[in-house]
Amino acid sequence: MVQCKKASIMPQTVASLKPLSIHATGAVDAQVFGARGARLARLAALGLDVPQALVYPPKLVDAIADGAEITWPRALGGQVLALRAAPQEAEWGGPESLLPIGVAADTLDHFIATRGEVEALRLQLQCIRNLGAAVSGATRNSIAPPPQSGDSAADLRHQIQTAREAYQAETEDAFPDTATGQLRAALRHMARGWHSASARILRAAKGAPEDAGLAIIAQVLVPNCRTGRLQFVDQSSGQAQLVGYVLQDGKEHPLSELSARECAALKALEAPLTRGHADACRVKFALDATGKPWLTDVRPAQRSARATLRIAVDLAKSELISREDALLRIEPRSLAEHLHHQIDPDETRDVVTTAMPASPGAATGRIVLSAQAAMAAEAQGEAAILVRHETSPEDIRGMHSSVGVLTIRGGMTSHAAVIARGLGLPCVVGAAELRLDMKARSFRGPKGRIFSEGDIITIDGTSGEVINGTCKMIAPDLGGPFTVLMSWADKVRSIGVRANADTPTDARAARSFNVDGIGLCRTEHMFFEPERITVMREMILADDAASRAEVLQRLLPMQRADFIDLFDIMRGLPVTIRLLDPPLHEFLPHEPDELEHLARVMNVGIDDVRARAAELAEVNPMLGMRGVRLGITMPEIYDMQARAIFQAAVAINAQGGAPVVPEIMIPLVSANREVELVKERVDAIAAAVQAETGSSFAYKLGVMVETPRAALRAKDLAKSSAFLSFGTNDLTQMTYGLSRDDAGRFMRDYVQRGVFAEDPFHTLDLEGVGELLVMAARRGRDTNPDLVLGLCGEHGGDPAAVRFCRLAGFDYVSCSPFRVPIARLAAAQASILAERGAALK
């Protein structure tokens, strides 16, 4: 059990402890006034109307809990009070408010004279009912039923007497019959409640220290008032609007029912509150009999991510905060809500299961279980959710045709997650509670719920929820405040942000997000168009180098056309092209009809196709014949790609304008000799193209650092490389010895049990993988001071990784197009905090 040590108060010091007025001048310490007391003091300092109030500081509250005597504060004489808890941090909680306090036998005549007999008696009954229930532990209704609007004075006197008797029966003590006695009982109850065992445990769970203190506010209740809540901006959009309600007869009534004068008085509060707090506010208020508003609390206005952005931009435009402060107020990841459809927060969700949110946004569509079915649905104009055990490169065309992707297996950097983020598709992965039955064309969810192909579901890639049926959506919002904020971010950031873009379509999306270039173009994704995949498969299944080279000549114009488009779209910006990386078996068909089609095209038997595919099979393909190993053992593949790149550069440069300087990246390198072998052939191809075309062009050759050995030997690699770009997906995988596709099965348990602070595929591991990055950066630049450093894994869109890369001296990060705004904002925040000398976390 958590123990809470309460400070001992010496008897001689108790008398010196006094309640403090919120209207006192000077600095207000939240440690003394509590969070709520400090807020009230600030309202008073702004010259706003706040009911008179005193704060009992924590040391005095502790003394009262120990039995210290108190008197009714002279400053609050003749008033009815409300007692409210004011811990130093609002989230720590505290005892419930107690009100009304102070209507007793010794004050009743005063209140009858000032408020009328019925109102005074009603207050006295409420006091006995509420305070009596709190002190005795009984329910309010067991002390007395609530007073009714038609009760006469005689009715109320009878109910008061009955309530006194009920209280005495519960406690064996008489109810306090003086205002001071009521105040003492209320304060003591709240103080002792704060130090109870259950309260200590709850506070500790919320991060409160053992010696956390409680202040208590005694505030005058505005007589004959209606209370309410109000904020000055719409919670969803952030646009200026009076939003709230007023309580009357125990019911919430819209502000529109108030008089025009009352609404104007409330509206007039907006300017001083916003100016005084440099933020949009929400308040609790009391309207007195004349319609004058009195403020009883203030908090930051409730707001969605979209509203947060608009509010920050509006405050900066009004010069209430700086542009830099506006940038710092936005959580970078929250920008995803601007970029994608989101489920309306008021929508009721029939959640089937919750898995890993791999790509933000939400989508509704019919279940399809294959890429072909997704393409067929698109052709018919139907929205489809592609559901697979896991995706592979041959599913990419189906993903393009879908509005969302759901996989049973996989993690944050699985194939489905990476491609979906690049396409801006909502994606949920690792839905292990679902049982996919391809024969039955359905999947079974928890509690035996069965969903068949063609049924409608919704996936929320922001929360990871899979939902039955349709959901109302909120559309993306990339205009106005979003554009303004991004322009401010670009003016202050000092690290480049590029995009991972594999096709011209991806490049156009990236360009729309104002990227600084393409940091990773995965050329293998260009081969999965229907008219190309068969040619690619012919090349893979060729028996010898000559046959392979012949087929590659048919692929050359296809690659060249894509590179021409990429260079044209990104004209004036760098484009980093990764040579073929995945193992060849990923391009081969698995479905019987596709195998038969390939056999017909190649004019061979289907058994021959199966046999050749079997020859290419590997026990651990991700660590086998892939990347640079393909380029060295089958050099004609990289030769074709290099030629296509250089011919495309010549074609674009012939049009005039900024010259294209291709950046060619070699994947999965572990030794500098690998780089030297590829470089020799690439340089030879460049010379040949220059001779053939009579054109000169510049290009850069670099390495994708994905293996721990490459990071450790960066000093060697820098001798032959113009740049090093760190592929942190595979680097994390190899550093940890984790499969990114299978880690989702246990990652949640590992994070919950504290093995990992975060999923290392989601947030960059700064201690392990980060140390490799820093080491490689330092060693590489020791050899080559002009070495360009980049990060092109999915971590490029992780705000913590962006800040880390800036500190480590990297030149750029690269991420999926729809994560570019997140990286741009994170980069700006890193620059601002560094300039201000703040510690980056």
Give, region by region, the residue ranges found by the protein language model:
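Nucleotide/phosphate-binding sheet-loop regions of phosphoryl- and nucleotidyl-transfer enzymes
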Residues: 2-346, 376-378, 382-385, 392-397, ...
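Short acidic loop-to-helix transition motifs that present clustered carboxylates
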Residues: 57, 391-394, 412-414, 433-445, ...
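Long, charged amphipathic helices and adjacent flexible linkers at domain junctions
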Residues: 203-210, 327-376, 383-384, 453, ...
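Short beta->alpha connector loops at strand-helix junctions that form conserved
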Residues: 54, 408-410, 429-432, 521, ...
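C-terminal accessory/binding modules appended to enzymatic or scaffolding proteins
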Residues: 26-30, 359-401, 769-785
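Hydrophobic alpha-helical bundles that form the membrane domains of multi-pass transporters
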Residues: 288, 426-428
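Conserved alpha/beta-domain cores
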Residues: 478-481, 488-841
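A short, small-residue-rich loop immediately preceding and capping a beta-strand
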Residues: 403-409, 427, 790
